[in-house]
Amino acid sequence: MSKRAFNFCAGPAALPDAVLQRAQAEMLDWRGKGLSVMEMSHRSDDYVAIAEKAEQDLRDLLSVPSNYKVLFLQGGASQQFAEIPLNLLPENGTADYIETGIWSKKAIEEARRFGNVNVAATAKPYDYLAIPGQNEWNLTKNAAYVHYASNETIGGLQFDWVPQTGDVPLVVDMSSDILSRPIDVSQFGLIYAGAQKNIGPSGLVVVIVREDLLGHARSSCPTMLDYKVSADNGSMYNTPATYSWYLSGLVFEWLKEQGGVEAMEQRNRAKKDRLYGFIDRSEFYTNPISVNARSWMNVPFRLADERLDKAFLAGADARGLLNLKGHRSVGGMRASIYNALGLEAVEALVGYMAEFEKEHG
């Protein structure tokens, strides 16, 4: 097998080699059963065991309290932009949203289709380079919920604190930083995360929802989008994304073997410190994000001369450093350094960046 490249894609993102090797070994014959997980009935005892173990491992990793349901759903995080208000926003109610970038803005735009949305705070006055402190927020009394994105993958902003909303349920899009460090699940009413960054392959979204928030869906809510229906049917009201669920379970096993989210926090801190440290010491590369809002997972950076961007990307590709091009809406470069990428990937990137700077700086 040729050497594996370092994949810095924002999503679908790198998966651990050990997980892919395990899936490869089990592809044609899962544990002597003579068939692939792809071919299993989702109602079979074997597949139900796979699904239940994946859920339990995720519960263990995040210390999910017993009064929360863990759902493995379809449609990705973007479908949750509609599913959340359909389940949690009464027709005459108001939901508060915090806008810190493109993904939280998309959530706001979708929620407005279903009811009243109050944008309680926005990072726009800071040019999306910093997150407004909660003392700047204009929260609605008795809001149905407060929604925010803990990490903006495109802009590279991340909350390093959890908003305090009292009795109002806190809803968070953790698509790009879930499992990257410990969290207190009990601080949230609902957590959702598209799988294709830190959980597994695309086609799946994980929802962790407090039980008291179930059963309030609008009468017009499609059955497939009703959290209570999903919870009552073990996320199997219809055929789930079985292989994505299975692969996510392998990732959870790998995370536990690595020492859990506590070990991931140490690993991720070392990676982001190395990369941001190099950028800050350089006179050729820049990252403009406020230091206390810098993402641990998605590191955008620019070259001193954007005319060199194509040469930089070509050289990176030639060295097996893939998918470093920034999002089309912001340009520049972006290195996504999720759990599956180790420090050696960041060291390889920094080495190339130093070499390129020496040649072109």
UniProtKB/Swiss-Prot annotation:
Q: GO cellular component annotations, sorted alphabetically?
A: cytoplasm
Paste the cofactor note: Binds 1 pyridoxal phosphate per subunit.
Which BP terms from GO are recorded? Answer: L-serine biosynthetic process; pyridoxine biosynthetic process
Q: In which pathway does it act?
A: Amino-acid biosynthesis; L-serine biosynthesis; L-serine from 3-phospho-D-glycerate: step 2/3; Cofactor biosynthesis; pyridoxine 5'-phosphate biosynthesis; pyridoxine 5'-phosphate from D-erythrose 4-phosphate: step 3/5
EC main group? transferase
Kindly list the cofactors needed.
Answer: pyridoxal 5'-phosphate
Which superkingdom, per the lineage?
A: Bacteria
CDD domains documented for this protein: PSAT_like
Which UniProt key words apply to this protein? Amino-acid biosynthesis, Aminotransferase, Cytoplasm, Pyridoxal phosphate, Pyridoxine biosynthesis, Serine biosynthesis, Transferase
Q: Please list the residues that bind L-glutamate.
A: 43
Q: Which Pfam families match?
A: Aminotran_5
Binding positions (pyridoxal 5'-phosphate): 77-78, 103, 153, 173, 196, 238-239
Per the UniProt record, which EC number(s) apply here?
Answer: 2.6.1.52
Q: Which residues carry this modification: N6-(pyridoxal phosphate)lysine?
A: 197
| Catalytic activities | O-phospho-L-serine + 2-oxoglutarate = 3-phosphooxypyruvate + L-glutamate; 4-(phosphooxy)-L-threonine + 2-oxoglutarate = (R)-3-hydroxy-2-oxo-4-phosphooxybutanoate + L-glutamate
Give the matching InterPro entries: Aminotrans_V_dom, Pser_aminoTfrase, PyrdxlP-dep_Trfase, PyrdxlP-dep_Trfase_major, PyrdxlP-dep_Trfase_small
Query: Does the UniProt entry include the keyword Amino-acid biosynthesis?
Result: yes
Compartments (UniProt record): Cytoplasm
Q: Which GO terms describe its molecular function?
A: O-phospho-L-serine:2-oxoglutarate aminotransferase activity; pyridoxal phosphate binding
Subunit details for this protein? Homodimer.
| Described purpose of this protein according to its UniProt entry | Catalyzes the reversible conversion of 3-phosphohydroxypyruvate to phosphoserine and of 3-hydroxy-2-oxo-4-phosphonooxybutanoate to phosphohydroxythreonine.
State the similarity comment. Belongs to the class-V pyridoxal-phosphate-dependent aminotransferase family. SerC subfamily.
The name this protein carries in UniProt is Phosphoserine aminotransferase
Q: What is the taxonomic lineage of the source species?
A: Bacteria, Pseudomonadati, Pseudomonadota, Gammaproteobacteria, Pseudomonadales
